[in-house]
Amino acid sequence: MEQYLSLFIRSIFLENMALFYFLGMCTFLAVSKKVKTAMGLGVAVIVVLTISVPVNQLVYANILAPGALGWAGFPDTDLSFLSFLTFIGVIAALVQILEMTLDKFFPALYNALGIFLPLITVNCAIFGGVAFAVQRDYTFTESIFYGAGSGAGWALAITLLAAVREKLKYADMPEGVRGLGSVFMIAGLMALGFQSFSGVSI
């Protein structure tokens, strides 16, 4: 259990998807204007990553990997060239299910997220989490913890950025750094702050 907890914490702080790998920056910058919306998208990313990472790991290990189809009588078959297409297809299906669920039960959040909800399908943070888990050959259980941790890390980062941006609305900032200029600087400073965790041994 300790190794799973270590993997979970490491994926939140040491290998943060947004502030270490700089993945998912399009939605990270665009949806971080309000804390409530940022938290909603963060929860959606956590759900999608927690499900899509282990599901795609299972698909790769049992169908796509070289020799994975030995159980079906095709030990020499290698379908790994279909990995990217398969991963995106699984992610798209999960996002579609999530979108329909939010539209049905949480219409206010669905309307607040707008176009960015279907864009989770092509959010490179989601795909990056899946690709990293497969590349590092995580087990199914490790994939669950890694997916949840990666999603939580991304959600934490966008929520913190949104909180700072809400405060900055009342700040008297120089003309040249208003808008996205200040957001890039804040994101950079946050990334530097998260880099301080790199010296921690977990």
From Swiss-Prot:
Keywords: Cell inner membrane, Cell membrane, Ion transport, Membrane, NAD, Sodium, Sodium transport, Translocase, Transmembrane, Transmembrane helix, Transport, Ubiquinone. GO terms for biological process: respiratory electron transport chain; sodium ion transport. One of its GO terms (molecular function) is oxidoreductase activity, acting on NAD(P)H, quinone or similar compound as acceptor. Its EC number is 7.2.1.1. It is a multi-pass membrane protein. It holds the Pfam family Rnf-Nqr. The chain crosses the membrane at residues 11-31, 39-59, 79-99, 114-134, 144-164, 180-200. Its main location: membrane. It catalyses: a ubiquinone + n Na(+)(in) + NADH + H(+) = a ubiquinol + n Na(+)(out) + NAD(+). GO terms for cellular component: Gram-negative-bacterium-type cell wall; plasma membrane. It is an enzyme of class 7 (translocase). InterPro entries: NqrDE/RnfAE, NqrDE/RnfAE_oxidrdctase, NqrE. It is found in: Cell inner membrane. Belongs to the NqrDE/RnfAE family. NCBIfam families: nqrE. Composed of six subunits; NqrA, NqrB, NqrC, NqrD, NqrE and NqrF. NQR complex catalyzes the reduction of ubiquinone-1 to ubiquinol by two successive reactions, coupled with the transport of Na(+) ions from the cytoplasm to the periplasm. NqrA to NqrE are probably involved in the second step, the conversion of ubisemiquinone to ubiquinol. This is Na(+)-translocating NADH-quinone reductase subunit E.
